[in-house]
């Protein structure tokens, strides 16, 4: 896989910088065996995108990366933002192909009020990110999603519902949806 070879070369090139980012922790978690990955796919009735599968089996199952770093495969199926930490349903299709947000958010008077908890709970429900792994925490409750089921299979999306900004695809300079490999390669290329 070309993006994985490129990422490996950049890891070697930027090793000192990655060490500083990791702050003496492991740069990458241990890789997963293909057998464990296949078991995960079988248990969740999905197939992981090939570039992501190569990354977690050849480079690391989580570690340094965009935002606050990559989550492990196991941690990526839990929505850490919600109090009850629910599992994300992977065998249902991701429902979006274009940016999404609730219409009421644009017209809400944020200076004088706060939405009722029932409305917020519906907005934050994991059904909005079905078919996705939460692969990285961006900060301030935002998360990067990797679509593993649905039309957007293999593409990375940004979930900014924590600040009421909705869910949107991560785009490259040509305004095109990007894959996991492209997303990670772009991050590591642009490290200073």
Give a label for each model feature.
Residues 1-127, 131-134:
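A surface-exposed partner-binding patch
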Residues 58-59, 73, 136-138, 148-149, ...:
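Structured loops at beta-to-helix junctions and adjacent beta-edge loops in soluble globular domains
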Residues 182-192:
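Low-complexity, Gly/Ser/Thr/Pro-rich intrinsically disordered linker/tail segments
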Residues 87-89, 165, 180:
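General helical structural elements
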Residues 4-7, 165, 186:
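N-terminal low-complexity/disordered regulatory or targeting extensions
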